[in-house]
Amino acid sequence: MKTLILAGAGHGHIQILSKLQNMDLDDLKVIVITNFDRQFYSGMLPGYINGSFSLEDVSFKVEDYCNNPNIELIFDVIEEIDKNENVVKTKNGSYSFDYLCMNLGSKSIESFGPETESLHYVKPIYGFKELKDIGGGKDQLLIIGGGAAGVELALAYSHKYPGLNITIIDKHDDILLKFNDRTRKLSKKILDFRNIKVMYNTDIEKIEGNTAYYEGGELKFDQALVSTGVTGVDIKYTGFEVDEKNFLKVNNKLFAADNILAIGDMVHIREFPHMPKAGVFAIRMTPILVNNVFHVIFGGGELESYVPQERYLQIINTSDDKAILSWGPFAMYNKLALKIKNKIDMDYMKGNLVTDSFMKRFEKK
């Protein structure tokens, strides 16, 4: 019997498990290793915070996708993955594999030391199950980083706590640098209307206690959220190629070795070294991953290559029953934009990325 290990339980692995749990796995043992009992979808996090969605709406319970006697779910922390020995080492054990697929995500760059009761990093997303209720009354919420996550979180908390004092700090001279001019103008107008302060060209040098220090000043806060970029997770990859941020190098078919694949934020695709870390790319990777994993294990079909889309839809939930939709140079701010976002997100959570007709290519003859 061969062994497939799924390291991590991201959405790509949920898709694989949703198919495997209904298959005859007499010749295959599947081990799922994760330290999180739920897998969250970051795109719906603002809606979860502002009260539009429940915990069940925005997350998967991993054990619900392990309903097959040949699928074993292990809750543990992965510390090392050894390509040479074909083994995954965790805090409490060691597991050999014939095939390995990794979906381990990324983590926030911890620029200001470890988390505290008042300092929080946006990733991993799991922590927001607890952060949903931070800050109320007249508290001061500081958000460091003016990208999409920072802006959406500011607007979500503003909706949830109308009396909350919110400040976004960014080291650049503008926010939402990966968006078009129209989107930036709309966002700044909305932030201003909601009394959310934005400090530009301000680089936080250190945080001590509940004080953030920058050149020429300091800012007191009750809670701080940091969203200033991501790095690879804290795992030792023995025998693999990684980049300077510990992102795992794979080819455009998502292979790190002949029997090892990976997907999502954790990967650095050699053919596309400058591809952004964004959920829209991971979504498009998922059918490629499922196809190639099943091809390696079961045969059938052909290996497929992933090519990132050059232009993609971006939607910012403004937590006022509207959203800003951005496409190329175009942007619109209205209720329709939010309806489009919610439709995309809910379809994504229903897991319709891999169809039954797609799976027929792997049926036993």
Model segments located where?
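Conserved beta-strand segments of alpha/beta enzyme cores
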Residues: 29, 70-72, 118, 165, ...
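A conserved FAD-binding loop/helix module that cradles the flavin
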Residues: 266-318
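FAD-site-proximal beta/loop scaffold in flavoenzymes
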Residues: 117-138, 218-284, 291
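Rossmann-like NAD(P)H-binding beta-loop-alpha module
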Residues: 131-167
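C-terminal auxiliary extensions adjacent to catalytic cores
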Residues: 319-365
